[in-house]
Amino acid sequence: LLDSGAPTDEEAARRVLSKWTDLEAFVAYAVVDRAIHHDDGPFHWYCIDGPCEPHNFYFYEEPASRRVHIIPWDLDNSLQGWTPEALNPVTAMPDAFGDTSNACDPFPFGSFNLLQRSAGCDPLVAAWASLDDEFERIDNNFRSGPFSIESVTMHVEGWRDQIAPHVAEAAALHDDAPSVAEWNSSVDQL
């Protein structure tokens, strides 16, 4: 995918990624991934028992168009780590998207000091992260649109209204179910 000088040349990166991906969708994936803190996915390179590598995603190639798409999975640790106190000791990431640390050598990080390497040291991630204009435009649109406080609050409140009767029913029937007050408190944290 990246054998055309893309990691060091922004125009080459754009050219190569445009050839093999839907560039808008590829950048939008990175925007959403970083916005929801999918810190246990393609931008977290663990160095445990072998080479440093990311996980929890697949690349899918459409045979007819020969376009590559990234498919995330195992997003259970997403939407965590909004504050330093809430950082997950395993999935905590030291670098912003595309940044590098420790001259690209593995280093311990997080409260468990897990060995990891900056994702920006990978040629594909470096090329991806070099698309600053696209990233900024898509990120601004995302954060002022579907990920805005108003939009997210509207959806969460709608889901609260749909789910609340079932939470009350479960709380009345099961001793181990959260109370309605506990559930509402958790929803309010969102």
Question: Predicted regions: what is each one?
Answer:
Residues 1-57, 62-190:
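Middle-to-C-terminal accessory/interaction subdomains
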